[in-house]
């Protein structure tokens, strides 16, 4: 089968290593972006940036917009616009959202892109050739909002504005009964194969209760074949079915294929025994990040489409929950949508990023409020930024402290602490705290890597907070500023001044190392703020191999200059009444 590309090919730069490939859902352009869209982006972007933090790894992130379908057609008609004009405008809102929040995608895909449209046609013809598509009359309950049919078992009747209407029990959107001739995909042929795959790959869907939900549904309910086209008389804004102008391709059949489009499929994929062999240098298979409301499309339809084509299945599907505002899912009808662009103007981009990642509980719905966001921002300012403020003052020298370590002045630091620490009652506790912090700092990358790669972002950030809190506590307990006073006192003997200088430099050095290492490791979450602090420290090594104690001994020059501004300004709670 010939495959033509009318648009420019995306040049994938991965040659020698297998890149990690992560995707967001492509966002439907019938409305403006909200915090939920940003959340999906940030889950993927954080993991993408984390992978790239390790110079031995490569990563590719895909995001974009879903631009076909009846909802867009209807919205365009109401606005008096051509659908393409509408999607061009709204798609920019999503790319601007990514730009505003430092989401470093490798491709922003649009389902109106030429290479994607060609891929959809190719895939349709492939399924036709394999005998998995047929025509039939279809009747059932159709939701315009969800652009899908629902079985009778998922329909309930409610009263709206004094009138009885049918709705989907899953999405709560209104449905209407329709009968029409469509093309169908033989989902039912692959039900047992998908069940066996899921049983053999229990980590395919994360978290576990989402995996169990899909597996139970497949085991308990016979899959109906899927209607994958709509009459052109009703749906005009979609990709035309090859060789049949009376039908348009169902939006989800079109949309899901975007993940393959970005891989340049089928180019480079060899066919062996009716299956496509993934090239060694291909970014495929993908790790998909999706919201729980589209789990069936990604965990039932999509794997079956790939099975039918003979293509390797995705690596994993990460299903996140929703953000609640005042206990309710954010929605346009409730008027509780949060505009991420607006809140970032007040709180800043990185504090919003950090709040969403720090509270990224994919198992359950997350609670959003500006009070919680303010509290999170204050913690970043008062703990993380406070470290550089403490050691970056005029009484200390980070550069001298780093040089003290390099020259071996801390080789006998335990003995010096035991002998010359002013508060003798706190020596044992201080030594114990120092041992724990140095151990935790050396293991911080491994700990965070474990949690980030398992999409347990909350625990990754907890590990990060732990060393920040320990360093602040040690600085407060050790009181290095008292040694500065003693060093400057004419009454202090020269020998003691030297010991106090070493003690002072050691505590400054340990806090500087905590700041350096923690700043490198928080770059995937707070890229702007971490850059400011690393710039102030004059750190050049900013990748994972520099995230152990003393891995970098060439920083600190100018860090204590009076010219530095605070990395994050304190702000008052916003009056949102």
UniProtKB/Swiss-Prot annotation:
Keywords: Aminoacyl-tRNA synthetase, ATP-binding, Ligase, Mitochondrion, Nucleotide-binding, Protein biosynthesis. Its EC number is 6.1.1.10. It comes from the Eukaryota. InterPro entries: Met-tRNA_synth, Met-tRNA_synth_2, Methionyl/Leucyl_tRNA_Synth, MetRS_core, Rossmann-like_a/b/a_fold, tRNAsynth_Ia_anticodon-bd. A motif ('KMSKS' region) lies at residues 329-333. ATP binds at residue 332. One of its GO terms (biological process) is methionyl-tRNA aminoacylation. GO terms for molecular function: ATP binding; methionine-tRNA ligase activity. It is found in: Mitochondrion matrix. A motif ('HIGH' region) lies at residues 25-37. Its main location: mitochondrion. This is Methionine--tRNA ligase, mitochondrial.
């Amino acid at each position: 089968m010939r495959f033509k590309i009318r648009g420019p090919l995306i040049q994938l730069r991965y040659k020698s290593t297998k890149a990690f490939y992560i995707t967001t859902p492509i966002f439907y352009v019938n409305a403006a972006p909200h915090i939920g869209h940003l959340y999906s982006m940030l889950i993927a972007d954080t993991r993408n940036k984390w992978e790239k933090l390790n110079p031995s790894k490569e990563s590719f992130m895909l995001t974009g917009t879903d631009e076909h379908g009846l909802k867009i057609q209807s919205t365009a008609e109401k606005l008096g616009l051509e659908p393409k004009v509408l999607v061009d405008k709204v798609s920019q809102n999503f790319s601007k959202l990514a730009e505003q929040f430092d989401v470093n995608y490798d491709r922003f895909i649009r389902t109106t892109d030429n290479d994607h449209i060609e891929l959809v046609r190719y895939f349709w013809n492939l399924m036709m050739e394999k005998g998995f598509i047929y025509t039939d009359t279809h009747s059932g309950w159709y939701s315009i909002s969800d652009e899908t049919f629902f079985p009778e078992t998922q329909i309930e009747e409610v009263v709206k504005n004094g009138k009885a209407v049918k709705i989907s029990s899953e999405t709560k959107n209104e449905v209407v009964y329709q009968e029409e001739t469509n093309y169908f995909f033989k989902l039912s042929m692959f039900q047992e194969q998908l069940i066996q795959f899921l049983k053999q790959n229990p980590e395919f869907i994360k978290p576990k209760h989402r995996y169990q939900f899909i597996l139970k549904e497949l085991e308990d309910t016979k899959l109906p074949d899927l209607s994958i086209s709509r009459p052109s008389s009703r749906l005009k804004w979609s990709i035309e079915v090859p060789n049949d102008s009376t039908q348009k391709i169902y939006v989800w059949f079109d949309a899901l294929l975007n993940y393959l489009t970005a891989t340049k499929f089928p180019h480079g994929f060899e066919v062996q025994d009716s299956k496509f062999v993934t090239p060694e240098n291909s970014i495929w298979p993908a790790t998909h990040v999706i919201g729980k409301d589209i789990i069936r499309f990604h965990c039932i339809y999509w794997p079956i489409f790939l099975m039918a084509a003979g293509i390797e299945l995705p690596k994993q599907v990460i299903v996140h929950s929703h953000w609640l505002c005042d206990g309710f899912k954010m929605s346009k009808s409730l008027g509780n949508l949060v505009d991420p662009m607006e809140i970032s103007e007040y709180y800043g981009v990185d504090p919003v990023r950090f709040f969403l990642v720090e509270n990224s509980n994919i198992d359950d719905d997350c609670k959003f409020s500006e009070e919680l966001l303010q509290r999170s921002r204050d913690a970043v300012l008062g703990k993380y930024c406070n470290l550089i403020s403490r050691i970056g003052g005029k009484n200390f020298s980070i550069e001298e402290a780093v040089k003290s370590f390099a020259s071996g002045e801390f080789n006998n630091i335990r003995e010096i602490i035991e002998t010359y620490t002013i508060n003798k009652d706190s020596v044992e506790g201080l030594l114990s705290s120092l041992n724990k912090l140095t151990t935790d700092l050396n293991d911080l990358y491994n700990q965070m890597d474990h949690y980030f790669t398992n999409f347990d972002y909350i625990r990754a950030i907890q590990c990060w907070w732990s060393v920040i809190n320990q360093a602040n506590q040690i600085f407060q307990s050790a009181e290095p500023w008292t040694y500065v006073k003693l060093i400057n006192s004419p009454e202090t003997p020269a020998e003691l001044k030297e010991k106090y200088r070493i003690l002072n430099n050691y505590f400054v050095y340990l806090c500087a190392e905590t700041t350096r290492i923690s700043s490198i490791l928080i770059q995937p979450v707070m890229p702007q703020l971490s850059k400011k602090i690393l710039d102030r420290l004059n750190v050049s090594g900013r990748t994972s191999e520099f995230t152990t104690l003393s891995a970098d001994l060439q920083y600190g020059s100018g860090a204590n200059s009076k010219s530095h501004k605070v990395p994050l300004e304190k702000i008052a709670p916003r009056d949102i009444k």
